[in-house]
Amino acid sequence: MAADKGISFLRLGADAGDGASTYEKAAVIKQHGIKVRYSLMKAYLLTPEELAEEAAGLEAHGVDEVTIMDSAGTMHPADAGAYVEALKARVKIPVGFHCHSNLGLSAAKALAAEEHGADILDCGLLGMARSAGNMPTELAVALMHQQGKALDVDLYKLLEFEDQELIPAMEKEGYRSEERRVGK
């Protein structure tokens, strides 16, 4: 049904160490011509080398992209770099990094991941996500602009959209701005 609706990819995920449990699901998705993006949740459960080994198994079973998930938001920038570096040395598919802001380090972790070769940085508008949130998209864009990257993304239009459309829509639905700041 997803393929009939023009879905181009589906994201699968499991806790680090449980990747083999999704091989069959990935194969079924691929049979329908849909790309598989895989989330290595709670990546810190394994060493960088063990996670890279799991990513290689996923790649061998047709996964098109893997994302290292700092699910608890407790990694440090050096950890982010080590995980990305280990995966980039082991697989040919794109490697992403997803970080939470529980320690206030999402920007530092994202920069470290990017410096060590991450192809994709997950982020959320206004940092929206569970717990203390994710790397805010607007911050990611600003940081990339400082490096001369992602210049096709208009930061000011993004900020205008958030201010004029997203925040009012959220408040209309009862989502208060202070909840955004404290992660309720």
Language-model regions, residue ranges each:
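Catalytic cores and adjacent flexible loops of soluble metabolic enzymes
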Residues: 1-184
